[in-house]
Amino acid sequence: MKRTYQPSKVKRARTHGFLTRMKTRGGRAVIAARRAKGRKRLAV
């Protein structure tokens, strides 16, 4: 059986990247929450 995690930098960035997060209201909320929490990495 094939493993479920098949890493791809492009797919990772397009799905979870900063620009993608900023496109939607919910994504901006995610970034804001991570900023408020003091995360070192806001997005991938």
Swiss-Prot record:
One GO term of the biological process aspect: translation
A cellular component term, taken from the record's GO annotations: ribosome
GO molecular-function terms, A-Z: structural constituent of ribosome
Keywords assigned: Ribonucleoprotein, Ribosomal protein
NCBIfam families: rpmH_bact (TIGR01030)
Listed HAMAP family: Ribosomal_bL34
Protein name: Large ribosomal subunit protein bL34
Organism the protein comes from: Polaromonas naphthalenivorans (strain CJ2)
